[in-house]
Amino acid sequence: SLDQMVRSLTELEAALTVRPAELEWTLARTDHVDADTEQGASALYSCVVRDADPAIVGRRFTSAAVELALASYPGFTTTAPPGDGQVYGVFTAGYVPIAEVAHVAVHPDGTRVPIPPADETLDLTDVEPPSTPQPPESGPTRRLPLGTIAGARSGDKGGSANIGVWVRTDEQWRWLSTALTVDALRELLPEAADLTIGRHLLPELRAVNFVIEGILGQGVAYQARFDPQAKGLGEWLRSRYVDI
């Protein structure tokens, strides 16, 4: 519960001589009522810490966390013994002059031809989004997983995630393009409710693409989520129930 997480954070911080730069708690309710296996009866309580000094997040931290948990949580166990911290990375966007990146065409006979950079370039400008088709006429609906009619793929782009969703028929596209809005996505994926989301229609593919900014923290190597590359984000969306 939230109260337990707050209490754990307070008690752990009091036990530490130095507080890490970042400390995050998550509770995954993987437990089931009247489970027939121990794993099925257990929840996963995770604490992630980050700091530039490996000593602060190493054995000093893990030992304090384990000792505190053993003294307070009945049935507490760990997924790994106390140990040293692991290196993580931070994604930062950067740019280099185009002339500094060699572009070479290699022909089948092995001949290499340098390709000079373009002499003229244009600034990126916004493109008018394609118009949406007329929504389907109102009628009876069924409460079903979105994946009943829609496919999806997802993945990482720096600290953001892409989700592409598509359907097979024009009738389904009329529904998808008008029903799966940014607001609808926020409701279906509550973890993205407070994040900036971009929506891009691809009518020739009967598809819509979403970009969820910042959901991966500072990139894949930052390990902000248990699914750091957002590969399962699309399947989570497909599993959510909607009125079709």
Language model features: what each stretch is:
Residues 1-133, 170, 186-202:
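C-terminal non-catalytic interaction/assembly regions of soluble proteins
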Residues 41, 157-159, 204:
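Short flexible coil/turn linkers enriched for glycine and charged/polar residues
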Residues 46-48, 162-166, 209-211:
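Structured core elements
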Residues 59-61, 177, 221-224:
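Short acidic, glycine/serine/threonine-rich loops at helix termini
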Residues 134-152:
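Structured beta-strand/loop patches that form or line metal/cofactor-binding pockets in enzymes
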Residues 152-171:
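Conserved phosphate/anionic-ligand binding catalytic regions in large, soluble enzymes, centered on
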